[in-house]
Design a protein with these regions (language model features):
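N-terminal small/glycine-rich loop or linker at the start of catalytic domains
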Residues: 1-4, 65-79, 112-116
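Short coil-to-beta-strand
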Residues: 27, 60-69, 97-110
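Active-site acidic/histidine proton-transfer and metal-coordination neighborhood
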Residues: 16-17, 76-178, 188, 255
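Basic, amphipathic N-terminal segments that precede the first structured/catalytic domain
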Residues: 22-25, 29-36
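Histidine-acidic metal/acid-base catalytic patches
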Residues: 1-4, 9-26, 51, 58, ...
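Glycine-rich, proline-tolerant flexible connector loops at the mouths of alpha/beta enzymes
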Residues: 33-57, 112, 116
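Flexible loop residues that form catalytic
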Residues: 35, 72, 113, 212, ...
Length: 271
């Protein structure tokens, strides 16, 4: 498995000097939360901004994994909002797919902006399938893939578990919608079971290693990274495992990143 880390572990908007140090630790990939590097992630984001960020990453010997935290700075964008919101969400996701492509990335992990609220489960499923079919058609030439991130019940009321994510993927029927797993959500959804991993084997393209509160990996004691890593190895997963941790200290964030790397190396056969 290939070790990566999200840029949410780094200072907002100004962190490119950290990339060589992360490479020296053993990280290979950077997962990009767009709002962590750009104040305007949409219409004010120029191709030169994207190219400069990619260059800084690649000059350090790293590679962009893809994007996550897609709508963090756009709470108005909702999968189950009104017609205007849904249309804008579609446009923004297509835009981010292009950004991901231009960064050299592959995966777009969609977690926020998809609470269904009063929308019934069957209607939400149908609307999500219709939305993703349109989005996947629009982005088919980008070489990117979207993943609905299965989240725990406290974080979302839509796609709580890999079974739901796989059902949507199968109904959409497009090659650029695939599966992702999140360590914390696996625990919260009771999915740390080999059968769950076996069922995801053929379509799993990305893994988030994380903790409650997005703490440094291994600190909470609530996530069995050893077991999750073993189950991933047992299905032959060899892709990126990304440390999804937030910046907890303005002065010690590099040591926190190093601590998380050691967890990836120890339990995910990474590095």
């Amino acid at each position: 498995m290939i070790p990566a880390i999200s840029n949410i572990a780094l200072p907002a908007f100004d962190h490119t000097e950290a990339f060589p140090k992360l490479a020296d630790m053993g990280y290979v990939g950077i997962e990009v939360a767009p709002s962590r590097i750009w104040r305007d992630t949409w219409r004010g984001l120029g191709s030169q901004d994207v190219a400069a960020y990619r260059k800084a990453i690649e000059d350090a010997g790293l590679t962009v994994v893809g994007l996550h935290s897609l709508v963090f700075d756009h709470p108005e964008l909702q999968l189950f909002g009104d017609a205007a919101s849904v249309s804008a969400t579609l446009d923004f996701m297509a835009h981010l797919s292009g950004v991901c492509r231009d960064l050299g990335g592959h995966t777009l992990i969609w977690g926020g902006g998809r609470k269904r609220g009063n929308v019934g489960a069957e209607e939400a499923f149908a609307r999500a399938v219709d939305f993703m079919q349109t989005l996947c058609e629009r982005t088919a030439e980008h070489g990117t893939v979207f993943c609905f991130e299965p989240l725990g019940p406290n974080d979302s009321d839509f796609v709580n578990g890999l079974d739901e994510a796989r059902a949507i993927m199968n109904a959409v029927g497009c090659g650029n919608l695939r599966l992702q797993v999140d360590a914390k959500a696996l625990v919260e959804n009771g999915e740390v079971e080999q059968a769950v991993f076996d069922d995801a084997r053929d379509h799993l393209v990305h893994v988030h290693a994380n903790e409650p509160g997005l703490d440094v990996l291994g600190r909470s004691g609530q996530i069995d990274h050893a077991m999750i890593g073993k189950m991933l190895a047992d299905i032959g997963y060899a892709g990126y495992v990304s440390a999804e941790q937030r910046m907890l200290s303005e002065t010690d964030y590099m040591n926190d990143a190093r601590e998380s790397y050691e967890t990836l190396r120890r339990y995910y056969d990474a590095g």
